[in-house]
From Swiss-Prot:
Organism: Rhizobium meliloti (strain 1021)
Similarity comment: Belongs to the D-alanine--D-alanine ligase family.
Domain ATP-grasp: 102-302
Residues that bind Mg(2+) 2: 269, 271
Function, in words: Cell wall formation.
Entry binding sites for Mg(2+) 1: 252, 269
Any single GO BP term: peptidoglycan biosynthetic process
Protein biosynthesis recorded as keyword: no
Cofactor: Mg(2+); Mn(2+)
Keyword match Ligase: yes
Subcellular location: Cytoplasm
GO MF term (any one): ATP binding
Name recorded for this polypeptide: D-alanine--D-alanine ligase
Amino acid sequence: MSSKHVAVLLGGFSSERPVSLSSGTACADALEAEGYRVTRVDVGRDVAAVLQELRPDVVFNALHGPFGEDGTIQGILEYLEIPYTHSGVLASALAMDKDQAKHVAKAAGIPVAEALVMDRRSFGNQHPMKPPYVVKPVREGSSFGVVIVKEDQSHPPQVITSSEWRYGDRVMVERYIAGREFTCGVMGDVALGVTEIIPQGHAFYDYDSKYVKGGSKHVIPAQISPNIYQKIQTLALKAHQAIGCRGVSRSDFRFDDRGDGEGELIWLEINTQPGMTPTSLVPEMAQHAGLQFGEFLRWMVEDASCLR
């Protein structure tokens, strides 16, 4: 039993609120089972006042999306001097901005796809890059707003310039990498293993593939050559360290296998607030490495600190 009081931050007001509610509820339940005193905090604009009144020993950050994983809540927790899980202010802000994260990764020698950043409103009838390419919001998660432009499309999709677009005006246009999708979790200074993600009935690992039951198949350990498996783990740890992450992160990759066992391996992005239900990718990897869900969360709580 632990006498620690843990405030689990969940919900919030980003487009990823439903995801956060799932993660936060699962984490709160598991932490209670581990013996912690848990308070669930559905985050609103008054979160600083709520936490000042609660004065928990640790905050478990189960928020996703802007405010929860872009350095904002991390800055509030630093100001309040409450130890918290996951990455700190700078690493969170860097990782949330796909463009900045890509620059840091490239400088660290991590292979990335060619890309450019532009205002989505400047899209005309001309392709900004030779198709196929991917358009993704610079500051969104859960694959919100991701559009794949195929080779046979004569002009960019109108949805990008539509008034109904709600993912910010800065978008990244990135060369599309064919092939298989892999992901690797990092816990502290250890890579947890590599999972292959196989979307079921979807062109890529979109929102439904991630969160709808049966939307994707997770293969762990990934069935891939040992040298590529090890390379993915090495690059995931390298990205975690280059961006300055703490606690847990997850890096996503595409591998275009040319059939020679080598192929092209590309790092796509890093997630400092990966999904945290028992069947989410990183907890699955932790279990594969020998850590049950509750034990994994206990490690995260005991790893919590300020000045992250």
